[in-house]
């Protein structure tokens, strides 16, 4: 980054229409993968006033109650009444999921699992930075924390007039590549019609904004825009149509790093749009955690049906302790970025995905989870367990 600059990122809450769609798509994936680890799933969702539509391609031996899954996700988010604009119990659910094309399947499946080809061509990026403790850019980290706190305050009854839909935006000021302040904060939250703007602003400022953002980064010059239109009663799928995969920058690095264009939600790990992006984050985070660089962006690319990446490249933006070419060599030695190897390395064949579909796929904390008889670790791509290997190999 320049010596003196501003950078802005945004996030949206779990009740935002596009995020409802993402969560439904990943809930469908989780339900199928819980019964059939090797299923092929590509699930897209559309939500609009009174209806949810799921579509896509699935190859599986599992049977799951797709309609109930859709309703449960909508209800759990908090859309339980026409008063809030959407009701999981009464909305229409349309299922138009079909089977995966055999043309794609023949390019992916192999006699030897490790030779599994990529499910599609494409390019994916991973990124990490030492500007926060989770090795993520500060603007997107703060933006996620704001809408996550909005959901907590709503669900706990702390601010009972809140409704599910919300958006946040944070502008950070950088000097010498380091965050030195927050210039602007935007938080728009859906609410019931009974709360006054004065009460809403005070509640949001005191119990959400100030609760989340570091006081040392706020100043008398920080701009706060709380529901800047003055009213946000109509929200959710009534206000806007929601679609899977429309918040790919929110899902990743808030615009701080490049994006290959492929969405994550609703896709099983054979789709490198998802699994290779997770692997890219894993590699970049371990490079930064190892102290090889302060910032790192890695790109990988694939051809459909081909196991080995067609390219691996990275940029440490002048912060590397060794050359970028040497780091690429270490990446090739230490990380196997073939699709099946990624799935094995990150232990991705578990129902872990719905949790990723709100508040970002990166910068999260790995945790042990049990679903039925299956116990596994979530957010495995956030581990830094290869940092020491990189450090030793680099001679640091």
UniProtKB/Swiss-Prot annotation:
The EC number(s) this enzyme carries: 2.5.1.6
InterPro entries: ADOMET_SYNTHASE_CS, S-AdoMet_synt_C, S-AdoMet_synt_central, S-AdoMet_synt_N, S-AdoMet_synthetase, S-AdoMet_synthetase_sfam
PROSITE patterns: ADOMET_SYNTHASE_1 (PS00376), ADOMET_SYNTHASE_2 (PS00377)
Subcellular location, principal: cytoplasm
The protein's enzyme class: transferase
Catalytic activity entry: L-methionine + ATP + H2O = S-adenosyl-L-methionine + phosphate + diphosphate
Keywords assigned: ATP-binding, Cytoplasm, Magnesium, Metal-binding, Nucleotide-binding, One-carbon metabolism, Potassium, Transferase
Cofactor binding, per record: Binds 2 divalent ions per subunit.
GO biological process, one term: one-carbon metabolic process
Pathway: Amino-acid biosynthesis; S-adenosyl-L-methionine biosynthesis; S-adenosyl-L-methionine from L-methionine: step 1/1
GO terms under cellular component: cytoplasm
Annotated binding of K(+), by residue: 44
Region ranges (Flexible loop): 100-110
Pfam families, per the entry: S-AdoMet_synt_C (PF02773), S-AdoMet_synt_M (PF02772), S-AdoMet_synt_N (PF00438)
Primary role: Catalyzes the formation of S-adenosylmethionine (AdoMet) from methionine and ATP. The overall synthetic reaction is composed of two sequential steps, AdoMet formation and the subsequent tripolyphosphate hydrolysis which occurs prior to release of AdoMet from the enzyme.
NCBIfam families (UniProt xref): metK
Record text on subunit structure and interactions: Homotetramer; dimer of dimers.
Family per record: Belongs to the AdoMet synthase family.
Protein name: S-adenosylmethionine synthase
């Amino acid at each position: 980054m320049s010596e003196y600059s501003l950078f802005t990122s945004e996030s949206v809450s779990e009740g935002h229409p596009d995020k409802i769609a993402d969560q439904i798509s990943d809930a469908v994936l989780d339900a199928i993968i819980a019964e059939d680890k090797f299923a092929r799933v590509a699930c897209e969702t559309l939500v609009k006033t009174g209806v949810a539509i799921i579509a896509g391609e699935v190859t599986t031996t599992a049977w799951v109650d797709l309609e109930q899954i859709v309703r449960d996700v909508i209800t759990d988010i908090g859309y339980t009444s026409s008063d809030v604009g959407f009701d999981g119990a009464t909305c229409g659910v349309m299922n138009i999921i079909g089977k995966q094309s055999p043309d794609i399947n023949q390019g992916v499946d192999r006699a030897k699992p490790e030779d599994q080809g990529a499910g599609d061509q494409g390019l994916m990026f991973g990124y990490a930075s030492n500007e926060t403790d989770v090795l993520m850019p500060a603007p997107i980290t703060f933006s996620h924390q704001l809408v996550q706190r909005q959901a907590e305050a709503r669900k706990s009854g702390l601010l009972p007039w809140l409704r599910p839909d919300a958006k946040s935006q944070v502008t950070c000021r950088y000097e010498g590549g380091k965050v030195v302040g927050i210039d602007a904060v935007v938080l728009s939250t859906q609410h019931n019609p009974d709360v006054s703007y004065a009460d809403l602003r005070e509640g949001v400022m005191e119990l959400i904004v100030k609760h989340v953002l570091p006081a040392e980064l706020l100043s008398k010059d920080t701009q706060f825009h709380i529901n800047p239109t003055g009213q946000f009663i109509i929200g959710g799928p009534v206000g806007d149509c929601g679609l899977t995969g429309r918040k790919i920058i929110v899902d990743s690095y808030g615009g701080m790093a490049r994006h290959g264009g492929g969405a994550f939600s609703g896709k099983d790990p054979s789709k490198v749009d998802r699994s290779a992006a997770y692997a890219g984050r894993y590699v970049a985070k371990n490079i930064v955690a190892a102290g090889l660089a302060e910032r790192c962006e890695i790109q990988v690319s694939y051809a459909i049906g081909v196991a080995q990446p067609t390219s691996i490249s990275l940029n440490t933006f002048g912060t590397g302790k060794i050359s970028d070419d040497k780091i690429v060599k270490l990446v090739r030695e230490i990380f196997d970025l073939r699709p099946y190897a990624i799935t094995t390395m990150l232990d991705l064949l578990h129902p872990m995905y719905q949790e990723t579909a709100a508040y970002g796929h990166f910068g999260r904390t790995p945790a042990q989870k049990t679903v039925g008889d299956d116990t596994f670790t979530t957010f495995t791509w956030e581990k830094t367990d290869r940092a020491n290997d990189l450090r030793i190999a680099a001679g640091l």
